[in-house]
Amino acid sequence: GGREHALAWKIAQSPKVEKLYIAPGNAGTTAVGENVNIKATDFEAISAFALKEDIAMVVVGPEDPLVKGIYDYFQNRPELKHIAVIGPFAQGAELEGSKEFAKGFMMRHNIPTARYKSITSATIEEGLAFLETLEAPYVLKADGLCAGKGVLILPTLDEAKKELKEMLGGMFGSA
């Protein structure tokens, strides 16, 4: 996506970069490096390619491989440890990967954050009642990776209640 293109574009400008591979890449990244047809979550294929091409650094753009532990994968294998991976370990990536985890972390560490309540299909009535205790605008966030689209900001209570029901009905997939 756009983030990966921006990273590749900037990295390609470094005089220290001899060759730049982007996996899987997109139409925009072809102008700055070589796209490689490997899914960002196929750690075995990425590591095999990195070893074959003598790659010194892996910069991870999308959240999905971070949450699934690509950093940990490289760090836990002796043959890959010498390859620098730019990105957090899996537990650190959970701050982005799970809104519930992030809110819990902030609460445990006294980091200021807005009031929240985690809602499931089973607790929808609790969620609707919680919305009534808040003031507009109402912010609803899906828990999980939604490619940057899992947040709704709604001006009225009626809209917030309607959208909460739709979110729990699968609006953002499994998130």
PLM segments and residue spans:
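Fold-independent oxyanion-binding glycine-rich loops
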Residues: 1-2, 23-26, 61-63, 88-89, ...
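ATP-binding N-terminal substructure of ATP-dependent carboxylate-amine bond-forming enzymes
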Residues: 1-88
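A general structural signal for well-ordered alpha-helical segments in protein cores
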Residues: 43-46, 67-71, 99-103, 127, ...
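A conserved helix-loop-beta module that forms one wall/lid of the active-site cleft
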Residues: 80-150
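Conserved ATP-binding module of the ATP-grasp superfamily
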Residues: 112-115, 133-139, 155-175
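Short acidic-hydrophobic, aromatic-tinged amphipathic segments that line or gate anion-handling sites
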Residues: 35-42, 117-123, 152-154
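A glycine- and small-aliphatic-rich helix-loop capping segment at beta-alpha/alpha-beta transitions
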Residues: 73-84, 105, 155-162
